Amino acid sequence: PAWLVDCPCVGDDVNFILTRGQK
């Protein structure tokens, strides 16, 4: 999503959330 590019500083948090959502 575009907001991910806007907040690269929270990339780790987003990645963690996405991982939880996918599993």
Swiss-Prot record:
Proregion residues excised on maturation: 1, 9-23
InterPro entries reported in the protein's UniProt record: Amanitin/phalloidin
Post-translational modification: Processed by the macrocyclase-peptidase enzyme POPB to yield a toxic cyclic heptapeptide. POPB first removes 10 residues from the N-terminus. Conformational trapping of the remaining peptide forces the enzyme to release this intermediate rather than proceed to macrocyclization. The enzyme rebinds the remaining peptide in a different conformation and catalyzes macrocyclization of the N-terminal 7 residues.
Keyword rRNA-binding part of the UniProt annotation: no
Cross-link (Cyclopeptide (Ala-Pro)): 2-8
Record flagged with keyword ATP-binding: no
Numbered residues of crosslink 2'-cysteinyl-6'-hydroxytryptophan sulfoxide (Trp-Cys): 3-7
Keywords recorded for this protein, A-Z: Thioether bond, Toxin
GO molecular function per UniProt: toxin activity
Protein family per UniProt: Belongs to the MSDIN fungal toxin family.
Function as written in the Swiss-Prot or TrEMBL entry: Major toxin that belongs to the bicyclic heptapeptides called phallotoxins. Although structurally related to amatoxins, phallotoxins have a different mode of action, which is the stabilization of F-actin. Phallotoxins are poisonous when administered parenterally, but not orally because of poor absorption.
Official protein name in the record: Phallacidin proprotein
Originating species: Amanita fuligineoides
